[in-house]
Amino acid sequence: MFDCSRHFPAFNSAKTFLQVLLGFIRDCSHPSSDIQLDHNEPLYIVELGAGSGKFSYFMIKALEEMTAVFDFPMRKIVFVMTDFTENNFNFWRDHPSLKKYFDSGQLDAGIFDAVEDTSITLWKSGKTLKAGSCKNPICIVANYLFDTLYHDIFQVDGGLLKEGLISVGSKNAEEPDPLDPEIIQRMDNRFRYNTISPASYYTDEEGDEEHFKRILLWYKDYFKNTSTGASLLLPVGAMRALRRLGALSNNKALVISGDKGNNHPEQFSGLMDPHIALHGSFSLMVNYHAIGAWFTSKGGFALHNPQEEASLKVSCFVLDSSLSTPGDTDWLGSSLSEKDTARSAKYPHLCRAFADYVDSFGPNDFFVLQKSIKEDTPNPPLRTVVALLKLGDWDPDVFFKFRDCILNHAPTCDQKLRNDLCRGIPRVWDNYYMMDMEKDIAFEIGRFYYGIRDYANALYYYTVSSDTVGMHHVTFHNQGLCHYSLGQLDIALALFKKALALNAEYEKARSWIEKVERETHSLPGLGSKVACLSLLDSDDATQFLNLSEIPHDVI
């Protein structure tokens, strides 16, 4: 259902975005702020293109945990999930992790097509957010969305501004089925470039004509004397969507966005056709610099992460119409960055949060770190993995990636490190947002507790696994091992038989049935109360632990 080709460290990013949002609210709460908050009115946080809802869940969960430090009544904050498909909406509506937030009114949802919609009708409250209806600034979160919206192609060549036009065909001479989705893998794109005038290119942009013209003139001026020229995309789809959303709150808005893209003009040097990435659909690099220029032209400002080597760029934008300067004609060269610097000085908490949580060590850095530990270190130390888990606040995806290291080393690590794991592992499950059946997090947590001989907790999570993912013969088998270790032979035998009933070829269950039956018959009268005589301390301990297997052959 969902595009899983993008890598976004969700929980780490959600907390980062929330810290930036908190900084913005603190600045708006100051008596001297140009944007005054009304504590009697809702403050809407809207995620565009929420997809599976996983990021929304992490954000509202983190928001709930920060209630004590938020400078705004938590009961008046409403997180709104949006997407353009009914399927995604239905998935959120029925998701058990979101239910309590929907029931409380803290979470709402609505269909919103970023290409054309001008309002959002909320499912739970029945309210419609439309132009001028939001008294407080609207806070917008957009991850991996802008790269899929409309872009215009431009080049600066020999001091001339040119528009790029694309003709799309197939590499095959004929396509029997023009609706075949695999055609996207055979796209044959041809580009041509025609000289244009920036002043007259955009003529119907609902009041944004002057702002778009300023952006084009800025790029033409910046690259006019370069021998290499420049190639750039103007994310008009993103800017049009943000224009319509900004209108909901009378042009008072905060936008936080993460995507693959560029935020410095030097990254556009050279004449080349735009790169089109294919991943089930297709997408383009987001020109965050241009989006920032649009905000600045409208009276706002932009904060960009200056890190150049990053697959995920995060930028923050503020729209504050009170900062606009009517009659200002200075929009070339360094004037944009100078305006950003002057205007952002009125938002010190926002700037500090962005510097601390994005610039210093942001979502991309976390992704790079965990990827390097996973791929470049064949056998990472357990202490390193625990430190990474703590840095990501026990993100279930990180736990799943490093489950083998945890399961292999937890039974033999020192007690202090094991205690650290035991304090954090419950949060892994607390943070879990189920999307599919491929990652059985509860089962893996059960394996962890089984490995450290905490059979009661192991049984609990094995039961959760059966309830959430479904019955599996290995889960029943492992439950049987737990009960055997607790001396509950009758229950263990029943579970081994359940495992064999689900998979008649599962020889390990058959062997354990024979073993338990022999022991039961040799100890008459003790039944289920027979004690397990320190089995894991015997020479068979390693073999015994190895019987706790990964279900469905997932590695």
Stretch-by-stretch model annotation:
Residues A142, D147-E206, I276-G280:
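A mobile, often basic/glycine-rich helix-loop segment
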Residues M1-Y44, Y57, N87-G132, G207-L216, K439, L459-Y462, ...:
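S-adenosyl-L-methionine
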Residues F212-D467, M471-H477, L481-S485, I491, ...:
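Rossmann-like AdoMet/SAM-dependent catalytic core
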Residues S52-F72:
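Conserved SAM-binding loop of SAM-dependent methyltransferases across substrates and taxa
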Residues W123-G158, S227-R240, S249-V255, G261:
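A short SAM/SAH-binding and catalytic strip from SAM-dependent methyltransferases
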Residues F70-D71, K76-D83:
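Conserved SAM-binding motif I beta-strand of class I
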Residues Y484-A494, V516-A541:
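Alpha-helical linker/edge segments of TPR/alpha-solenoid repeat scaffolds
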